[in-house]
Amino acid sequence: MEIDLMKHIQKTKFIFVTGGVYSSLGKGVSASSIGRILVELGYSVAMQKLDPYLNIDPTYLSPLQHGEVFVTKDGKEADLDLGTYERFINADLNKYASVTSGKIYYEILTKERENGFDGKTVQTIPHVTSAVIDYIKKIKDSLKTDFIIVEIGGTIGDIESLPFIEAISQFKTIYGVNNVMFIHCSPLIYIEKVGELKTKPTQHSVKTLRSLGINLDLLLLRTNQKLDEVTIKKLAWSCGLDIDMIFAAYDVESVYLLPNVLFEQGIHKTILDFFSLPLKNDNINSWIDFTDKITTFKKHNLVIGLVGKYVELPDAYKSVLASLELAAIELNIDLKIKYIQPQNLNENNINEELKKINGIVIPSIAGSIKGWPGALLAASYARKNNIPFLAVGTGVNIGIGEFINNVLKLPIEFINLGNGDFSFLKDAFVKNEIENYRIGEYCSNIQANTITSQIYLKQNQLNERHRHHFEFNNHYINNYFLNQNWKIGAISVDNNYIDVLEYTKNHFYVLTIFNPEYTSKPSKANPYFINLLKMSLKIKES
């Protein structure tokens, strides 16, 4: 790595966000909230996640351990936090926005096996740290925004994250101290019996950061208690910060309210002053208009059933839930989600379990066959009772399988992947032999006189993100479905692939082989989720 002490002012400013004391602190939402404020003030923002785990990416991580796999526009399988980033800053990120230790080490070791280091000893410093810095530069060069906010995964003090911490310490020297800000998120522990906020864990976390070469520029405290002046002064003194560099990320009713909380404290002024940047706009009124819809009295209420293999961890369906939430906010609906484990559904309890459900969503499902009978029962209940139904991604198997089983009376067979799991139904789906894996954004032609044409008003095409190896078998669908009250809602622009199927006897029974949840944004929830709720409400109140 060449050390170029660039002390002059850089156009792109960097904010690095670390977390202390324990994981699942909410630093991703905190970082995203800062990003949203900067966007509202007229600055362009990109975000990046540096994750210390040794998986190359989250493709094969269990959803029960790590939550959903998010997919970027350019086809990167990424940490679910990227979905949070995109929704908050209202921007599409790219393949450089998600980097893991596993990816860094894999690339270094591959290069070493090819003698790419000319016989040099490969070490954490400088080779690993330089690789991290290269990825930080790549997102800057590819997205060219005013700000880049980088979240460091894990907790300060974890051995896994040390190369990342060293890398960002070096980066500040390389890029210029006036162009890089360090923010640390840390909890204040409230002892209810004595009514006291304990600051010692945060003090130790900051001390650990200092020992690793990171001097804080701003401290963001997670707490559900109002910060008092004594606590702020105590932390300022012990952490070597001015009191105006300490802010509180209070617990809020909705994560989308956190930008409001931070803006009211003036965090934007501190950040802009640090970088010597002007205050282009003195309000975040457009965001407040959106969040006012969250806190206002709801005129309507709905219950949507989410049927999925991993409902024990809702984060496994993070973007689906976010899409439903954002759609409900737009429509002024008090939305309740009923999580339904398909393995618990059977012929004896299906009516009781679903009788109060106004709509059903089946997200991507993969893995063992155990939950199939219950999932098919849910799809059958929706089809027979005209319950609005949306199956996305690999969840289209359920809508197709139910019809094959109950209407066509054909046997259900699965494509054997050789590991006890299934991916798609045999015959109804075929492996994509041309592209192998459709992942990322693809364009589809909307077909006339369909539900899709009604919800994508004045559009002839749609752009959605895919993540699948298999496609609808066009021949099978043409022979068995299109003469049985099914329509093609959208087809790929090259006419090779069916992307949307719709059952026309129901008001809203839609199967999308792409994952529409990935493109929902505040004030612009994906149309499929908007119309699922619209139709659910219409049927309920009719």
From Swiss-Prot:
ATP binds at residues 24-29, 81. The active site is at 517. This is Putative CTP synthase. GO terms for molecular function: ATP binding; CTP synthase activity; glutaminase activity; identical protein binding; metal ion binding. GO terms for cellular component: cytosol. Its EC number is 6.3.4.2. The gene is pyrG. UTP binds at residues 23, 198-203, 234. Homotetramer. PANTHER family: CTP SYNTHASE, CTP SYNTHASE-RELATED. The lineage of its organism: Bacteria, Bacillati, Mycoplasmatota, Mycoplasmoidales, Mycoplasmoidaceae. CTP binds at residues 23, 158-160, 198-203, 234. It comes from Ureaplasma parvum serovar 3 (strain ATCC 700970). CTPSs have evolved a hybrid strategy for distinguishing between UTP and CTP. The overlapping regions of the product feedback inhibitory and substrate sites recognize a common feature in both compounds, the triphosphate moiety. To differentiate isosteric substrate and product pyrimidine rings, an additional pocket far from the expected kinase/ligase catalytic site, specifically recognizes the cytosine and ribose portions of the product inhibitor. Signal peptide: none annotated. It catalyses: UTP + L-glutamine + ATP + H2O = CTP + L-glutamate + ADP + phosphate + 2 H(+); L-glutamine + H2O = L-glutamate + NH4(+); UTP + NH4(+) + ATP = CTP + ADP + phosphate + 2 H(+).
